[in-house]
Amino acid sequence: MGIQHEFDIIINGDIALRNLQLHRGDNYGCKLKIISNDYKKLKFRFIIRPDWSEIDEVKGLTVFANNYAVKVNKVDDTFYYVIYEAVIHLYNKKTEILIYSDDENELFKHYYPYISLNMISKKYKVKEENYSSPYIEHPLIPYRDYESMD
């Protein structure tokens, strides 16, 4: 059947982007467009629940915001999940964020989901599902301890 990891993103403990993993495969990622009218500092928590059936190691995560690399820190690593965190500063009205385990252009074009988050109007939308089944949870009700961003 193939590998299928689970990949979620929690933003500021308030918004959850769920099921960002591909239907099959060892890659995970997404493209985000965030619209805001003033400076914002957003805390991102990236949660990977690995499928160990065919792999020995979980791929790392790379994040770019408006073509600038974002420092990503691994904060927890267990058999059941791997958690990374990053802080992204929004300076522009529109911020494009790329999050990925593999930056192959074809994955962004046809496989990774594309999500729009309008922080002004609080409208959050999955623009393109591509080869995944993402959904947005807002407000977030953490149902696992590691989803809380205390």
Swiss-Prot record:
Isomerase recorded as keyword: no
UniProt superkingdom: Viruses
Induction / repression: Expressed in the early phase of the viral replicative cycle.
Annotated InterPro entries: Poxvirus_C7/F8A
Pfam families for this protein: Pox_C7_F8A
One GO BP: symbiont-mediated suppression of host innate immune response
Keywords for the protein's UniProt record, in alphabetical order: Early protein, Host-virus interaction, Inhibition of host innate immune response by virus, Viral immunoevasion
Family: Belongs to the orthopoxvirus OPG027 family.
Function description: Inhibits antiviral activity induced by type I interferons. Does not block signal transduction of IFN, but is important to counteract the host antiviral state induced by a pre-treatment with IFN.
The protein's name: Interferon antagonist OPG027
Annotated source species: Variola virus (isolate Human/India/Ind3/1967) (VARV)
Native organism taxonomy: Viruses, Varidnaviria, Bamfordvirae, Nucleocytoviricota, Pokkesviricetes
